[in-house]
Amino acid sequence: ADAASYISRQPERNIRILEKYRNDKRYLSKRNFLKERSIFGLDFVFREIPNKLDVFDMKTFKEYDGRFVIVTTDAKTGKVHYFDQKDVDETFEVFCATCALPGACPPAKINGRKYYDGGLSNPIPIDKCLEDGCDKMLIVLTQPEGFIKTPRKSEKNMAKIMKLKYPAIAEELLKRCDKYNESVRLCEKLEKTGKAVILRPKYKLNSLESDTGKLR
């Protein structure tokens, strides 16, 4: 979803929002989880900010003449599902799906179905780029060179919980690390052959990094 601000020609918008609101309890906090079952304040992040506080240029976004793909995971099947800019409206529900992580945020409801973050089924959708005919790719990774994702006990425990209601998501949780590492290897292979350029930090970042200085 962060890339949307580049499509709307507002490249400074993401860091501006993070610097101003990342440590605001309305943005992300345990209090939100108690109130909404989500660590993110979904209404604040996806309704109040883009529609009032730091307005997202929906008109420019919609007029983009390329295709902007949003990657999600179908909660029932565990399969990857792709949306594009025509599916985005002022509710930003499609973007809500991109932060819907099991245990941290409920799935987003879109057209009668529920969706989780695409990172579960397709962590780095480089295969989608290749299928769509892209011959030169700019790949932005969130971890430094040499990083290998390893299973965490918390993920295994969450998979057990998710298995009761969303068994397919539970399976994807357990396969997530292998899929991520495999995707990184493919990215590096493409970089060596000149088909991709990889941008990544020199230091490790937490998934919910609160140090906005590191993010800049």
Label for each model-derived stretch:
Residues R9, E155-M158, L215-R216:
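Short, hinge-like loop/turn segments at secondary-structure boundaries
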Residues F40-E63, D178-N181, I198-Y203:
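C-terminal domain-closing interface element
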Residues A1-K52, D84, D89-A97, L138-L141, ...:
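Patatin-like phospholipase
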Residues T91, S183-R216:
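C-terminal helical/tail subdomains of lipid-metabolizing enzymes
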Residues N32-F40, K79-F83, R113-Y116, E171-L173:
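Flexible, glycine/proline-enriched loop segments at strand-loop-helix junctions
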Residues K136-K189:
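Helix-centered, glycine/charged polyanion-binding patches within enzymatic domains
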Residues V55, N122-P123, V184:
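Structural motif corresponding to alpha-helix initiation and N-cap regions
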Residues F61-A159:
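Active-site gating loop/helix substructures
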